[in-house]
């Protein structure tokens, strides 16, 4: 068993749907978790597919909620965005960018390959301080409500297995292979150092 609580981060593009659904589920299971986005702005579905609603990362979930409520309550209720923002507000005030976080994690889950690339690049560009390893694992999760929930449960299952592991470093690869077979998903995995 790990000697201390597993420190987990979940990262998607905007820190709104996939990472926050995982954050919600992992937190309910008692895990130490934070969530992040990697883009320069938060982008939410807008009135047309090519016209997203764009917010700065400093905008709180409550401010986004109120803005969308004012713009088109029916549309943003129907597409689930108001529900998502309400859930997010109960977890933390607003979205956070991974690149601005200086905390250390044992495992970082990313929800798409481009986010994985950004996280790995960011970690590799930082000056190494402690040489503590951090496992970065990518699992492709479509940015839909249903897929975010399914992905969050799979991330939770992996975290619970790691939390119970006698040696995370030795058991992680085997665990990921088992999860690939079970879930029919493939994972990218690398180790970076703080």
Curated annotation (Swiss-Prot):
Gene3D superfamilies: 3.40.50.2300
EC number: 3.1.3.16
One cellular component term from this protein's GO annotations in UniProt: mRNA cleavage and polyadenylation specificity factor complex
Segment forming the signal sequence: none
Domain of life: Eukaryota
Localization terms from the record: Nucleus
Gene Ontology BP annotations: mRNA processing; termination of RNA polymerase II transcription
Keyword terms of this UniProt record: Hydrolase, mRNA processing, Nucleus, Protein phosphatase
Enzyme class: hydrolase
Biological role: Protein phosphatase that catalyzes the dephosphorylation of the C-terminal domain of RNA polymerase II. Plays a role in RNA processing and termination.
Name of the protein in its database record: RNA polymerase II subunit A C-terminal domain phosphatase SSU72 like protein 1
Protein's organism: Homo sapiens (Human)
The gene coding this protein: SSU72L1
């Amino acid at each position: 068993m790990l000697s201390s609580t597993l420190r987990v981060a979940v990262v998607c593009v905007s820190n709104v749907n996939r990472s926050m659904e995982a954050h919600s589920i992992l937190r309910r299971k008692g895990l130490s978790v934070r969530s992040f986005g990697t883009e320069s702005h938060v982008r939410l579905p807008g009135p047309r597919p090519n016209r997203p609603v764009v917010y700065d990362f400093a905008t709180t979930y409550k401010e986004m909620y109120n803005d969308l409520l004012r713009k088109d309550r029916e549309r943003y209720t129907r597409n689930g965005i108001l529900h998502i923002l309400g859930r997010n507000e109960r977890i933390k005030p607003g979205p956070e960018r991974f690149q601005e976080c200086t905390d250390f994690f044992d495992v970082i889950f990313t929800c798409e390959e481009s986010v994985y690339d950004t996280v790995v690049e960011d970690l590799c560009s930082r000056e190494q301080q402690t040489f503590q390893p951090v496992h970065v694992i990518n699992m492709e999760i479509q940015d839909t409500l249903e897929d975010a929930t399914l992905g969050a449960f799979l991330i939770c299952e992996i975290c619970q297995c790691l939390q119970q592991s006698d040696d995370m470093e030795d058991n992680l690869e085997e665990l990921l292979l088992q999860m690939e077979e079970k879930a029919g998903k493939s994972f990218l995995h690398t180790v970076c150092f703080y």
